[in-house]
């Protein structure tokens, strides 16, 4: 017997009405209902939904970092949502940075009861200034003799051990500390942001800096070289009390904005949390520029005295290479990715050795990393250097060189084939990117291990032996791979020299 459930008449009427209402509510989906109708795509495109979507952290942001560094200074309220925070500091004022241990139970047990080493740096935020950091810091050193860019306020600091400030690294300090104990370090930044701007008409904006902290643990040999954690934040430094005035100005500007405009900006926080970043590379540049302060050997400038041999000239420092090799282990490959600013892809390439990475084609890395980072990674893997804008060759003139040149001229009169006594002269290549007289001065000074301040002027020997002052425009008109002999004259007023390109 089949059983059928029969609804009363009233229930059947209700059910029929509900079905009709539901059908009616669905009938308009996907159709244009009129000028005032909303489409679902328009609704999802509203800023509120976009913000909620972008605020969802990716998987790698959910991880708890082993350490956290907190700068006790308020962030600016004039920073837009999703932009990095910006913090204003006063020149020479002591600011506390709290060193916090965030490790979970059982995480990094090898540092329990041991010290770690943290290195603090003040570096440039702008990529353009990062490329010329050596020149910028050297210029600051000569304008502010005896001063440092970064210092530790030792009396106010707590829990730091063996603080050090290398006299040749003006922007770096370091110390040891125990993660299990309370540690706070007070730092002072002595340079201001406007010292590195192009002076034009006054009132210029200052360049932003970065405070970066790199922490290392001890290796088997007792050296603190194994990287644990790195974090940084963006700052601007003002003259005393200037940061307070700037913070007040930003706050007043925000108060004048409408509630809708305020939603586009971050609130001001009482402290600044340093965010995770790539470790600072041990070797910053791939050209011959030494790291600020590490080249402390200033040999005497013997160019003009005629006592140097053309066959025994000062050797420039060897070019720095950081190429990935097929024999590189997966662990070394991870370190290479960090050093070359590919930290975001270390998880993707966890098990890749050097040989695995080098086998990737251009299309492979672009598909994995995206067009911008993919091309950058491919060029880094292949060790491709950027071709300099101008290459010139220089040779140091000396008394022996003059004598040999005279001998060659005499022998050439006897031997028309030009085959003289077989001597040859060593030239050094100078690679120029900015094509300026300042850059040429620095390159020549670096080549002969002297200070740029010891070079007063650079001249080019012109027709009839006249001395033409080198300018930016003249350098821009140098021929590629032009050869010059360097001669010198003692300056009249001080211990510097004039360089003559022949």
From Swiss-Prot:
In PubMed:8114710 authors noted that a 10-fold molar excess of isoform 3 over isoform 1 inhibited DNA-binding. It is found in: Nucleus. The modification Phosphoserine is found at residue 353. The gene is TFCP2. Signal peptide: none annotated. Binds to DNA as a dimer, isoform 3 does not bind to DNA or affect the binding of isoform 1 to DNA. Interacts with UBP1 and PIAS1, and is probably part of a complex containing TFCP2, UBP1 and PIAS1. Component of the SSP (stage selector protein) complex, which appears to be a heteromer of TFCP2 and 2 copies of NFE4. It comes from the Eukaryota. PANTHER family: ALPHA-GLOBIN TRANSCRIPTION FACTOR CP2 (PTHR11037:SF11), TRANSCRIPTION FACTOR CP2 (PTHR11037). Belongs to the grh/CP2 family. CP2 subfamily. One of its GO terms (cellular component) is protein-containing complex. Residues 238-268, 294-325 are annotated as: Disordered. Its main location: nucleus. Ubiquitous. Expressed in brain, ovary, kidney, thymus, spleen, liver, adrenal, heart and lung (at protein level). Pfam families: CP2 (PF04516), GRHL1_C (PF25416), SAM_3 (PF18016). Changing residue 234 to L: Significant reduction of DNA-binding activity. It comes from Homo sapiens (Human). This is Alpha-globin transcription factor CP2. Keywords: DNA-binding, Nucleus, Phosphoprotein, Transcription, Transcription regulation. Disulfide bonds: none annotated. Binds a variety of cellular and viral promoters including fibrinogen, alpha-globin, SV40 and HIV-1 promoters. Activation of the alpha-globin promoter in erythroid cells is via synergistic interaction with UBP1. Functions as part of the SSP (stage selector protein) complex. Facilitates the interaction of the gamma-globin genes with enhancer elements contained in the locus control region in fetal erythroid cells. Interacts by binding to the stage selector element (SSE) in the proximal gamma-globin promoter. One of its GO terms (biological process) is positive regulation of transcription by RNA polymerase II. Residues 241-265 have a biased composition (Basic and acidic residues).
């Amino acid at each position: 017997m089949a059983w059928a459930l029969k609804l009363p008449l009233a229930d059947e009427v209700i059910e029929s009405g509900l079905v009709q209402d539901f059908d009616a509510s669905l009938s308009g989906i996907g159709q244009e209902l009129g000028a005032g109708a909303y489409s679902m795509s328009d609704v999802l495109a509203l800023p509120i939904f976009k913000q909620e979507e972008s605020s969802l952290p990716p998987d790698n942001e959910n991880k708890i970092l082993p350490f956290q560094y907190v700068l006790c200074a308020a962030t600016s309220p004039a920073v837009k949502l999703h932009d990095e925070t910006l913090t204003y500091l006063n020149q020479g004022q002591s600011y506390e940075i709290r060193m916090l241990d965030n490790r979970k139970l059982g995480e990094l047990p090898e540092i329990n009861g041991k010290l770690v080493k943290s290195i603090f740096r003040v570096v440039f935020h702008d990529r353009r200034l990062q490329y010329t950091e050596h020149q910028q810091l050297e210029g600051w050193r000569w304008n502010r003799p005896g001063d440092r860019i970064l210092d530790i306020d030792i009396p106010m600091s707590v829990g730091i051990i063996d603080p050090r400030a290398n006299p040749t690294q003006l922007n770096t300090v370091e110390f040891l500390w125990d993660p299990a104990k309370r540690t706070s370090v007070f730092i002072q930044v002595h340079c201001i942001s406007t010292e590195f701007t192009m002076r034009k008409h006054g009132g210029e904006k200052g360049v932003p800096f970065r405070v970066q902290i790199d922490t290392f643990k001890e290796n088997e040999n007792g050296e603190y070289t194994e990287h644990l954690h790195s974090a940084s934040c963006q700052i601007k430094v003002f003259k005393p009390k200037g940061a307070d005035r700037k913070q007040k100005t930003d706050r007043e500007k925000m108060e004048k904005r409408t509630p809708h405009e305020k939603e586009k900006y971050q609130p001001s926080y009482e402290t600044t949390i340093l965010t995770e970043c790539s470790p600072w590379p041990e070797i910053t540049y791939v050209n011959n520029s030494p790291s600020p302060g590490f080249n402390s050997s200033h040999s005497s400038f013997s160019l003009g005295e005629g006592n140097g041999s053309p066959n025994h000239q000062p050797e420039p420092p060897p070019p720095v290479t950081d190429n990935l090799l097929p024999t590189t282990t997966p662990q070394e490959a991870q370190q290479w990715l960090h050093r070359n600013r590919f930290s975001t892809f270390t998880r993707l390439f966890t098990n890749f050795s050097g040989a695995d990475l080098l086998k990737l084609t251009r299309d492979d890395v672009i598909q994995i990393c995206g067009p911008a980072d993919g091309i950058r990674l491919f060029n880094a893997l292949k060790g491709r250097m950027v071709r300099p804008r101008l290459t010139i060759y220089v040779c140091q003139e000396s008394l022996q060189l003059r004598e040999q040149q005279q001998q060659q001229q005499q022998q050439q009169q006897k031997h028309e084939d030009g085959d003289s006594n077989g001597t040859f002269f060593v030239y050094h290549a100078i690679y120029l990117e900015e094509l300026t007289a300042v850059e040429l001065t620095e390159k020549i000074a670096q080549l002969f291990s002297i200070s740029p301040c010891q070079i007063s002027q650079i001249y080019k020997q012109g027709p009839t032996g006249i001395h033409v002052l080198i300018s930016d425009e003249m350098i821009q008109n140098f021929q590629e791979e032009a050869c010059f002999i360097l001669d010198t004259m003692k300056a009249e007023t001080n211990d510097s020299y004039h360089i003559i390109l022949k």
